[in-house]
Amino acid sequence: MHDAYYNSDNTLVEATTKIGLAAEKLFGAVFNDYAEYRSANADAGRCIIENGDGTLSMSSGRLQLGANIVSDTFGFAIGETDEAKCPIAVSGRVLAYPLEDITMYTPGAAVCSGPEGTISLMTREEIKEWPDAIVGYVSEIPTYDTWGSDNVPVNGRIWIKIK
C-alpha cells in the first residue's frame, strides 16, 4: 500500500505499508453476499419459512410470507453457534431450486416460495396483491455445472437476487 500526503510546511511525505496475509481460505474477500446462521435443517438452495417463534420450516406452498433461501454461495456469514448451523441468505445472490421448468424463468422476474422448498414465479397480479411474498428476483440461469473456487454444484438451481 502506498500513500502520499503533504506536511504542514507543504513538503511531500510518502509512506509505504506492507501488509501480509496468509490463509488457507479467505471468506468475503470479494463477495457481497451475506448470510445469517439459523437453527434449521434444510439443504442449500431450499426455500424456508419463518414460523414466528424463531423456528424455520421448509416452504410448503406458494406465496408464503417470511420466506428465505438457504445459501451455499455466501461470502460473509454471522451468528454461527452450536445450534445455528444453517446459513440463510440475507443479501446478494443465492442459488435456489425452481418449481417451474427452468426455461420459464427470465432475469428480473419476481419469485416467491413454492412447495417442497422451491421458489416459484409470480404473476403480475400476485406481485401487486402480495408484494410482501416476494423472496427476490431472478438474476441468472446458469449454463454451468459448478460455481466458484469451491466448485459449488449448481444442480439445476437458478440465481436469485435477494429482496
Feature map (PLM): residue ranges:
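Extracellular receptor-binding modules and their adjoining Ser/Thr/Gly/Asp/Asn-rich linkers
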Residues: 1-163
